Amino acid sequence: MKEYIKSSVSKNRKEYYLFNQTPIFILNEFPPHININQIIQILENYIPKFMFSFIEGIYIGEFEELKDRNIQALFKDSAIYLSSFKDSEGVSEEIIARDIAHELAHAMEDKLSYEIYYDSKIENEYNGKKKKLLSILRYGGYKIPEELFFSDEMVDELDDFLYKKIGYDKLSLITPGLFLSPYSITSIREYFANGVEEYLLGEPAVLKDISPILYNKLDTLDGQLFSGEMT
């Protein structure tokens, strides 16, 4: 990624800023119907300024690592790397803003890991939900070893099983009331990031209903960061 960024320095790279402090570097343009200023407006209207202090910047381009992993965004090395969505149908400013919010959550987790997880409450809520889902799937005829769901070394295998063996569409029908989305099942990091995304740019009331402990943690952190208790 760094080499790709360096090679673009002499080209027509565009720069924007969030809250006049966090740079957005556009190495490859979004599709014509996407308005970068509208994305910035969404982010500035709904995401607290302090959250952008967790990153050094946002890079938008055609990054091989994103393509290889079949993902649209990634938090890495204190920055967010985002696809330019040149081949994506149905993409909107709202979708892109949510992708950024999701990666901001990973940046927040990187900086505030102790504050988020020290009391094990989120972990217990997350694991309790996975136990319920495992019971539902076994009742439905799936033979699933428990270690697939609860081993930190098998996160990729679990993701592959959920996506290919069961399918996200089917999981969406099984998991209402348990998880915000099938993607949040795979790891506690994704459970947390999906929660932050919903808290900031979705429906906080839905998060509070589905994941009350996660919601309360975010509400507490939000208040502490705004008041300066953690700065």
For the regions a language model picked out, list residue spans one by one:
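Pan-zinc metallopeptidase signature
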Residues: M154-T231
